A protein has these predicted regions:
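The feature captures the beta-strand-to-loop junction immediately N-terminal to the Walker
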Residues: 33-35
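Catalytic Walker B motif of ABC-type/P-loop ATPase nucleotide-binding domains
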Residues: 158-162
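Conserved ABC ATPase signature
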Residues: 133-137
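Conserved ABC transporter NBD signature motif
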Residues: 56-64, 76, 112-116, 219
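ABC-type ATPase nucleotide-binding domains, specifically the catalytic core motifs of the NBD
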Residues: 12, 68, 93-114, 122-124, ...
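Helix-to-loop junction immediately C-terminal to a conserved catalytic motif
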Residues: 48
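ABC ATPase C-loop
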Residues: 150-151
């Protein structure tokens, strides 16, 4: 379970997140929702330590994330798929996946473990294209690669920032099915920023609604009312 209490984040004089508090229950999917520019991505970056933030509590299970350096957080079972995918375009698909593996020989920077077979089972296209360069993949294939890379350390918490943004519909369906499978069959805790209402309805066991850096509503997925949708999500 991810527990956040009174999290605040500022850029200079701009206060971006205001006393955000919620829990992402274990083995459930929690959707962070809200219009563009309300602080959703900043919230995920704060959890991963990529932006400075202040909080009374920021814990994953019994691990105090406030005491963990950003580069150490993945080794405590937290995987993060950011916006933009951050694929290495000149590396092969296989080498992009291996980037997520721990270094066994620090002097040679050697990664001796193989890519877990379950990655290729989840995303068969990555096996078919594992010797192709990451830059040769379509946007949807790159997103599958980014998710696969996040999974190589077998995390307990998977954090995704708009994983279906700008992707062709057939791959959106594939990615959504994988997220549901990881959550429902494999028992991963999932925290996902999502904008598409039909996917929120499909994925969300719980939701957290952000508006101008404030948490204005939260609850179980079926408690996301039409009034909340019209007030905070409609364009």
């Amino acid at each position: 379970m991810l527990t956040i209490e009174n999290l605040n984040q500022s850029y200079g004089q701009s206060h971006i997140l205001h006393n955000i508090s919620f829990t992402a229950p274990e083995k459930a999917c929690t959707c962070i929702i809200g219009r563009n520019g309300v602080g959703k991505t900043t919230l995920l970056k704060a959890v991963m330590g990529q932006v400075a933030a202040q909080a009374a509590t920021l814990k994953y299970g019994n691990i105090d994330l406030l005491k963990q350096r950003p580069e150490k957080r993945p080794y405590h079972g937290i995987a993060y798929v950011p916006q933009g995918r951050q694929i290495f375009s000149q590396l092969t698909v296989e080498d992009n996946l291996k980037i997520g593996l721990p270094v066994h020989n620090k002097r040679s920077n050697e990664r001796t473990r193989n890519v877990p077979e379950m990655i290729y089972e989840l995303f068969p296209v990555l096996f078919d294209m594992k010797q192709r360069r990451g830059g040769d993949l379509s946007g949807g294939q790159q997103q599958q690669l980014a998710i696969g890379r996040a999974l190589v350390l077998n995390p307990g918490l998977l954090i995704l920032d708009e994983p279906t943004e700008g992707i062709q519909p057939n791959i959106v369906d594939d990615i959504t099915k994988v997220i549901r499978r990881l959550n429902q069959e494999w028992g991963l805790t999932v925290l996902v920023v999502e904008q598409k209402l039909h996917l929120i309805n499909l994925l969300a066991d719980h939701f957290v609604l952000i508006e101008r850096g404030h948490c204005v509503a939260k609850g179980k997925g079926d408690e996301l009312t039409e009034e909340l949708i019209q007030t905070y999500l409609s364009v």
